[in-house]
From Swiss-Prot:
Keywords (A to Z) from UniProt: Cell membrane, Membrane, Transmembrane, Transmembrane helix
InterPro entries registered for this protein in UniProt: UPF0060
One Gene Ontology term, aspect cellular component: plasma membrane
Membrane topology qualifier: Multi-pass membrane protein
Bilayer-spanning residue ranges: 7-27, 33-53, 60-80, 85-105
SUPFAM superfamilies named among the record's database cross-references: Multidrug resistance efflux transporter EmrE
PANTHER family, A to Z: UPF0060 MEMBRANE PROTEIN YNFA
Subcellular locations according to the entry: Cell membrane
Family: Belongs to the UPF0060 family.
Pfam families: UPF0060
Predominant localisation class: membrane
Organism expressing this protein natively: Clostridium perfringens (strain SM101 / Type A)
Name under which the protein is recorded: UPF0060 membrane protein CPR_1507
Length: 111
């Protein structure tokens, strides 16, 4: 159960980081109102808090390394759904390798 909560927090952090960053992108690059930037900044603050919800035995380095791999996969998916850029075989292979790597980093049994 703890691993499921942990994965949920990684996914939630990804949604908040990508969502907050996208709102700021819309404000600065596409001329949306300042409210987009403000909401984006608040969402990014929440993104910074979410990783602290990982299990007590987690350490900063492993949590952020793992999140980096999750972010890679979520970014590929976001590019596909938001920007209509279909992932090619190299995107998929790279995302898969990153995902396997972070699962080992975060969840491999340690003595």
């Amino acid at each position: 159960m703890e691993n499921i909560k942990s994965i949920f927090y990684f996914l939630l952090a990804g949604v908040f980081e990508i969502g907050g960053g996208y709102l700021i992108w819309l404000w600065l690059r596409q001329g949306k109102s300042l409210i987009y930037g403000i909401i984006g900044a608040l969402v990014l603050i929440l993104y910074g808090i979410i990783p602290t919800l990982q299990p007590e035995n987690s350490n900063f380095g492993r949590v952020y390394a793992t999140y980096g791999g999750i972010f890679i996969v979520l970014s590929i998916l976001c590019g596909w759904k938001v920007d209509n850029i279909i992932p090619d075989k190299f995107d998929l292979i790279g995302g898969f390798i990153a995902l396997i790597g972070v699962l080992i980093i975060m969840y491999a049994p340690r003595g």
